[in-house]
Amino acid sequence: MRAVLLGAPGSGKGTQGERLSQQYGIPQVSTGDLLRAAVAAGSELGKQAKAAMDAGELVSDQIVIGIIRERLTQPDAAKGYILDGFPRNFTQAQALDEMLATLERPLQAIILLDVNFEVLMRRLTGRRTCQACGAIYNIYFSPPEVDHRCDKCNSDQLVQRSDDNEETISNRLRVYEAQTAPLVDYYEAQGKLYKVDGEDDITKIAKNIGQILETAR
């Protein structure tokens, strides 16, 4: 199975990607993780990516596509893969399709996790992390049993990330929406886009995605 998980920040892409990876025995390919690994390994593409990041620039699509290509030609991706976090826009989608065509391994399904803007805001602004043990909560959906106190270690150091404020998150979501609209149209035209209600519980979402992937095989 060769698939892409699309969704806004807070839509649950990472969680569903992990479940699909385990279920199908195929790698979850996150561009963020790939870039960090390439930089750490000191590969040629990793060096180019590091140079861009050190200069405060975005890593070019050409470099990212090259790193993805290297990853998808590894043995564990022979049966398929789940792309998480890429493509982010129309240009990247076209470049990805062109690269996959050279490998003769086109995408089979693009899963869009559809979540209401207000729900995304609550998911992201409500996140709290225990500084003592790393446990993660959400004050709206999965709060600690006692306000401001960690269930696991009893610490009162539950903090909100500095970039989890409403203004920053709202801007991130607006940018995502603007970039993703043409991407959705692009994959719909190919007949490969499937929308899944990302507000259901995690198990039901996973079941719905699994049914789609079985059909798309």
Curated annotation (Swiss-Prot):
| Pfam entry (one) | ADK
Q: Which InterPro entries match?
A: Adenyl_kin_sub, Adenylat/UMP-CMP_kin, Adenylat_kinase_CS, Adenylate_kinase_lid-dom, P-loop_NTPase
Q: Name the CDD domains for this protein.
A: ADK
Q: Which positions bind Zn(2+)? A: 130, 133, 150, 153
Spell out the residue ranges making up region: NMP.
30-59
Q: Does the keyword Cytoplasm apply?
A: yes
- What are the protein's UniProt keywords? ATP-binding, Cytoplasm, Kinase, Metal-binding, Nucleotide biosynthesis, Nucleotide-binding, Transferase, Zinc
Location in the cell reads: Cytoplasm
Which pathway does the protein contribute to?
Purine metabolism; AMP biosynthesis via salvage pathway; AMP from ADP: step 1/1
The residues that hold AMP are 31, 36, 57-59, 85-88, 92, 161, 172
* Catalytic activity, reaction form: AMP + ATP = 2 ADP
Q: Which domain of life is it from?
A: Bacteria
Region LID, as annotated, extends over: 126-164
Q: Does the keyword Zinc apply?
A: yes
Provide the binding site for ATP: 10-15, 127, 136-137, 200
- One CC-aspect GO term: cytoplasm
Q: What is its EC number?
A: 2.7.4.3
Q: Which GO terms describe its biological process?
A: AMP salvage
The terms under GO molecular function for this entry are:
adenylate kinase activity; ATP binding; zinc ion binding
What PANTHER family does this protein's entry cite? NUCLEOTIDE KINASE (PTHR23359)
Q: Which HAMAP family match?
A: Adenylate_kinase_Adk (MF_00235)
User: What is the recorded function of this protein according to its Swiss-Prot or TrEMBL entry?
Assistant: Catalyzes the reversible transfer of the terminal phosphate group between ATP and AMP. Plays an important role in cellular energy homeostasis and in adenine nucleotide metabolism.
Protein name listed in UniProt: Adenylate kinase
